[in-house]
Amino acid sequence: MANIKSNEKRLRQDIKRNLNNKGQKTKLKTNVKKFNKEINLDNLSSVYSQADRLARKGIISLNRAKRLKSKNAVILHKSNTNSTAKKQ
């Protein structure tokens, strides 16, 4: 337990930020699940914007955001090529 006032304040700030960051990460996971359930460009753009925002704020690493965006773009591309192949 912190005995110094500045340490106590820092602890309070860390707890508040941790809760906020957890909520933001949960929103990202929800957007990814929504994209995986219904694969379309609108859901992909929401995943992109959310991942970019979290990476810019430092909540997730920049490399993790890039991997996430790349993985979901591949999924969208594969679903589009499969749907066009089925039509022919």
UniProtKB/Swiss-Prot annotation:
Keywords: Ribonucleoprotein, Ribosomal protein, RNA-binding, rRNA-binding
GO cellular component: ribonucleoprotein complex; ribosome
SUPFAM superfamilies: Ribosomal protein S20
Organism annotation: Mycoplasma genitalium (strain ATCC 33530 / DSM 19775 / NCTC 10195 / G37)
Sequence ranges of Basic and acidic residues compositional bias: 1-17
Transmembrane portions of the chain: none
Family: Belongs to the bacterial ribosomal protein bS20 family.
Superkingdom of origin organism: Bacteria
Gene field: rpsT
Protein's UniProt name: Small ribosomal subunit protein bS20
GO BP: translation
HAMAP family linked to this entry: Ribosomal_bS20
Function: Binds directly to 16S ribosomal RNA.
An example molecular function term from Gene Ontology annotations: rRNA binding
rRNA-binding listed as a keyword: yes
Xref: InterPro entries: Ribosomal_bS20, Ribosomal_bS20_sf
Region Disordered, annotated ranges: 1-25
